[in-house]
């Protein structure tokens, strides 16, 4: 097997091959309240990671992330994918955390569910949170994880 460069790659490789997603507690001592979801395969690593998943895989990925977030923080959850320019790990991952109050900015895209979450095409990140029965998706930013409790 090819040697991979980051700790998240190694974490994914420790898991059974049949698991499509891996949940890990963020190992940073500065982020004690954060979790991460990673696709187990390395096929999504690198630039434009979500574009490398099929629509069905992406919907399942987002459903799993939202399920974990709701289990941890009820309706106060947020998900954040940092953009290509600021991502510090090569293995694709999304931050799962408690959404900070008062961070809603601009005009988010409002979607009905995980299957409708768009794929950033320009290397930017996105962050997502619930709004009633729908989701607010914020696009066009690089550093998105700052909307989550550390």
What are these model-derived regions, one by one?
Residues 1-150:
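HIT superfamily nucleotide-processing domains
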């Amino acid at each position: 097997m090819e040697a991979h460069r980051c700790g998240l790659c190694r974490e994914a490789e420790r898991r059974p091959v049949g698991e499509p997603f891996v949940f890990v507690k963020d190992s940073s001592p500065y982020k004690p309240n954060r979790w991460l979801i990673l696709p187990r395969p390395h096929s999504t690593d690198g630039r434009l990671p979500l574009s490398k998943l099929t629509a069905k895989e992406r919907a399942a990925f987002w459903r799993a992330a939202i399920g974990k977030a709701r289990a941890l923080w009820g309706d106060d959850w947020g998900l954040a994918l940092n953009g290509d320019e600021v991502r510090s790990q090569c293995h694709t991952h999304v931050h799962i955390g408690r959404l900070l109050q008062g961070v809603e900015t601009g005009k988010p895209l409002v979607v009905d569910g995980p299957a409708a979450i768009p794929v950033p095409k320009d290397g930017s990140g996105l962050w997502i949170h619930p709004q009633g029965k729908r989701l607010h998706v914020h696009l066009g930013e690089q550093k998105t994880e700052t909307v989550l409790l550390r």
